[in-house]
Structure formats: C-alpha cells, structure tokens
C-alpha cells in the first residue's frame, strides 16, 4: 500500500468571521466530526470591525486538536489539510517575531471608505475594475492594508525593509502552521485584494504603486490545489480557497453557468463563467474561482454584507428572538410581512448598489405591525438581496439559471428557502451535505495529495436533500419586489453628510 492509502481522513480548517472550525472528512466525503470555537469581535468605532490574529490562530489550532481527539485519530492518519477562510480580512505581521503590528481588519470594516473615495477622485476606478475585477470599495484588502501602513507608525518603512509580511487569513494561518517557513496565498484569495491582476495572474505593479504598498511584503500566489508545505507535526497542507470559492467547488459548480448562494454572516452568490472573465455592467465582481482540477476559472460574484447578521441583530440587540432557529416559527405565524420591509444596511449596501453611505431602516410600520412581521421582514430581506444580485448576474452572463444551489447556516430555515424560491421564481436546491465550504477545501486538498482521484469521483458524492419550487404568482412576486426596491432607494446615501 502507498502512504496515502494508509491515511483515510482529510481535515478542513474553516476560518470564518465569527468562529474557527475544524471538520474531519472520510473517503466518502462524510463528516466524521466537527469542532468549533468562537472568538471576539472588536468594534473600536462605528463601522470599524477587527479581530485579533493571534486569537484566530489560537482558536484554529485548538479546534484541529479537538477534532482529532474527538474522532480518536492521530495526525499520521490525516492525508492533508485544506484551508478555507473569510476573505479580504487583512493581517500584517513581523516576519521575525511573528507578532501582528495591528489587529486584523475584517472584510466588513468600512474605515477605508475615504481612501476609496480618493481613488475614485483620482480617476483609478476603471483601472481597478479592468485589472482586478473589483469595484472600488473598502470591502477589499488593498485599502485596508494601505490604512495600516498609513496609520501604524513606522510600518511602511519596515515593510519596505522586508521586515513585515501581509496576508489574508489563509496566508497568516499557513505561515503560523509551518513555523514561518511558507508565505503563500492562492489565486482565489489574491483576487480579493484589489492588488492582483486577474488576467496575468500576478500582483499588479500599478496597483501597488497607487496604494504605495511594498511588493516585498506580499505572499507568493499559487493554485488552489497543490501541496504548499507541512505543519510542524508533518501534515501536508494541500488546498486553499476563499470561503465562497470553496463553497462553489464543494457544490461542484465547476461548469460555466452553474451558481450557488452561501447564507452566512453575509450572503454570497457566485456563478461560474469558466475560462471567461465576464466584465459586469451591473455591479457584480469578476473574481477567480476553482476550475475542475483546482486550476484558475472565473466567476461573477455578488456580495450582500448583512444576511445572517440581520438575524443576529434581532437576537442580540433587539432581543426579540432567543435563538436564530426561532425566526422560522415566528415568520410562519403571519401570512405576510404586513407591508413591512427591513433593509439591513448596517454597514452600507453591497452588490449591486455598492453604497457605503446607506444605513439600515424599517419601512411600512403601522399600529398593526407585530414583532412577527418584523422578524418575517428580516428573513425576507435576505431573499430580496439575493434576488438583487441574481438579476444583475443573469443580465451580465446572458444565462438564465434553472436552479440555485444553496448552503450556509440559514438554509436550515425552510421559510427562508421557500420565500427565496418564490421571489426568484427559480428552483432552490438544498444539498444533504451542509458543510459545502469545508467540503470544497477538503476536495481541493484531497485532489492535491491523491486522496481522491478525479472530479467524477467527487461529483458522485453530491446528494440534493430538498428542492424548493416557486409558488408565488408573477403579479404578487413583482409587487413584493417593487416594494423592496422602493425601500432600498430610501436608505441610499443616508450617512454621506455625516462623513463629509
């Protein structure tokens, strides 16, 4: 037997916005066990979001140890590790000490809005779009990195001297797990930085010049499925993909026109466009995805900033539900939202609006409105935002989706999934395997080390648990959606005067 035949497990490390997880898969792509730890969110100012990079690594290390112990496994039985991560979140650390120079600036953080406005005033918007596939928005890593270099004393000079390293969360974790030996990222994560040319597949010299970022601090960029290095205990690290691209691969959306939506803290809809980098006319991002063998493919992406976080707000701030699972019960207690629309623009609006100055609002309140209606409106807002993105994506690609594959925590909510199908007028497919993001990372690692032999083998493992068919008539569907568009229009530009 070969060495790989003696190793019957893959570990996927899923480093998310609110927690670090480790999921162990067997050869049939079944989950053997899962370990999870939450970590602190830091909000130093309105619109600012930070994480402690050391806590990210500590929790991610701990859950890997926990998962192995829980499964009764030794690291010698693991063929490889696949890593999937919250994207865009920006870490800068000292190459010698391994200590971060500042907290990780999270993808949700809007502190670099003014930097983005200056880029637009300087006429760089079209170049950024054409080269990186991205819109000029604080969401992406480049302006976050510039903020750190501008605001942490001595950091730019230290970066120029080769003393500091930059990475998205995948780079940070791999650097730590390999004891500082490997400084890499993959094409999917690099494509989210606003520093990477998605056509030449290289760091873009002009973007680095525009943002005054030293080339020396950037990681080497590699394919999403190859062996990058080994942990201190000798486990191969064999797959990397940003969380949404990992989910696309885990759903086996590897052919042009296939699409998925992940319902997490935010919502992310990706459509595979194959070897064609489609330039969006409707506010979508052009991004890099994983091809059939982990090579570069392209995708259109629409990012909704507040999905599951809207339900967290109901629970943690308004305290009108005790648990996210309760929202389905309350939403089903009423026949509709009674004309209420909740626009959860807590941190601005993502695709297709890209308005950092929009703010959240409730519309249509009357004395007849109850808590149930507001809870229902919150769930409906997730589906409406998904339609905003999907409509734009279909116009760009010229393709009509026959079905939308879904994953993420909120897909367990049957009310939301049915309303999603209704407001889209499109079948929604919920897979039996809910861990599609982690599964995508596991697939990439497994293909890299020979644990799985082919894409065909992986396709055979996909099972649809339930299909949700549209049940709303066309007139009612469009009436509801028209109300949503009206509500969104009233939230636009709300905070602009405060910022000026």
From Swiss-Prot:
> Which of the seven top EC classes does this enzyme belong to?
transferase
Q: Which reaction does it catalyse?
A: glycerol + ATP = sn-glycerol 3-phosphate + ADP + H(+)
Q: Binding of glycerol: at which residues?
A: 87-88, 139, 243-244
Q: In which pathway does it act?
A: Polyol metabolism; glycerol degradation via glycerol kinase pathway; sn-glycerol 3-phosphate from glycerol: step 1/1
- Which EC number(s) are documented for this chain? 2.7.1.30
Q: How is its activity regulated?
A: Inhibited by fructose 1,6-bisphosphate (FBP).
Which CDD domains does this one have? Answer: FGGY_EcGK_like (cd07786)
List residues binding ADP. Answer: 17, 21, 265, 308, 409, 413
Which UniProt keywords are given for this protein, alphabetically ordered?
ATP-binding, Glycerol metabolism, Kinase, Nucleotide-binding, Transferase
- Please tell me where ATP binds in this chain: 17-19, 265, 308, 312, 409
Task: State the Gene Ontology BP annotations.
Answer: glycerol catabolic process; glycerol metabolic process; glycerol-3-phosphate metabolic process
Q: Which domain of life is it from?
A: Bacteria
Q: Which residues bind sn-glycerol 3-phosphate?
A: 17, 87-88, 139, 243
What GO cellular component entries does it have?
Answer: cytosol
One MF term in GO for this entry? glycerol kinase activity
- Report the function annotation for this chain: Key enzyme in the regulation of glycerol uptake and metabolism. Catalyzes the phosphorylation of glycerol to yield sn-glycerol 3-phosphate.
Which family does the record assign? Answer: Belongs to the FGGY kinase family.
What name has this protein been given in UniProt? Glycerol kinase
Q: What gene is it encoded by?
A: glpK
């Amino acid at each position: 037997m070969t060495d790989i035949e003696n190793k019957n497990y893959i570990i996927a490390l899923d480093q998310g916005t609110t927690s670090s997880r480790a999921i162990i898969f067997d050869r049939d792509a079944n989950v053997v066990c899962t370990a999870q730890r939450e970590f602190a969110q830091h909000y130093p100012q309105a619109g600012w979001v930070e994480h402690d990079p050391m806590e990210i690594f500590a929790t991610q290390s701990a859950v890997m140890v926990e998962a192995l112990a829980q499964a009764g496994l030794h690291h010698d039985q693991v063929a490889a590790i696949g890593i999937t991560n919250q994207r865009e979140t920006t870490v800068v650390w000292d190459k010698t000490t391994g200590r971060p120079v500042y907290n990780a600036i999270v993808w949700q953080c809007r502190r670099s809005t003014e930097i983005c406005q200056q880029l637009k005033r300087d006429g760089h918007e079209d170049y950024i779009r054409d080269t990186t596939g991205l819109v000029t928005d604080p969401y992406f890593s480049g302006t976050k990195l510039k903020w750190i270099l501008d605001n942490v004393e001595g950091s730019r000079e230290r970066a120029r001297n080769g003393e500091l390293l930059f990475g998205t969360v995948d780079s940070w974790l791999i650097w730590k797990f390999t004891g500082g030996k490997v400084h890499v990222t993959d094409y999917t994560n690099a494509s989210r930085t606003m520093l990477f040319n998605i056509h030449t597949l290289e760091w873009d010299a002009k973007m680095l010049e525009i943002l005054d970022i030293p080339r020396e601090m950037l990681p080497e960029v590699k394919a999403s499925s190859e062996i990058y290095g080994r942990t201190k205990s000798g486990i191969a690290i064999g797959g990397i993909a940003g969380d949404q691209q990992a989910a696309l691969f885990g759903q086996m959306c590897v052919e042009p026109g296939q699409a998925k939506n992940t319902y997490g803290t935010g919502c992310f809809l990706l459509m595979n466009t194959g070897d064609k980098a489609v330039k969006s006319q409707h506010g979508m991002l052009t991004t890099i995805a994983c091809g059939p063998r982990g090579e570069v493919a392209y995708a259109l992406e629409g990012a909704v900033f507040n999905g599951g976080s809207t339900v967290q707000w109901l629970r943690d701030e308004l305290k009108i539900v005790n648990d996210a699972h309760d929202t389905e019960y309350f939403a089903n207690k009423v026949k509709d939202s009674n004309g209420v629309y909740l626009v959860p623009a807590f941190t601005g609006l993502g695709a297709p609006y890209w308005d950092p100055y929009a703010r959240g609002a409730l519309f249509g309140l009357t004395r007849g409105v109850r808590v149930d209606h507001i809870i229902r409106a919150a769930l409906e807002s997730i589906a409406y935002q998904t339609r905003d993105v999907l409509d734009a994506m279909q116009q760009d690609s010229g393709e009509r989706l026959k079905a939308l594959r879904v994953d993420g925590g909120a897909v367990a909510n049957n009310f939301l999934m049915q309303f999603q199908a209704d407001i889209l007028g499109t079948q929604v497919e919920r897979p039996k395997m809910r861990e599609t993001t982690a599964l995508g990372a596991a697939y990439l690692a497994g293909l890299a080390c020979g644990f799985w032999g082919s894409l065909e083998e992986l396709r055979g493992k996909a099972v649809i648990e339930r299909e949700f068919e549209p049940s709303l008539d066309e007139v009612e569907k469009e009436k509801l959606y028209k109300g949503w568009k009206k509500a969104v229009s009233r939230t636009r530009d709300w905070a602009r005067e405060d910022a000026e």
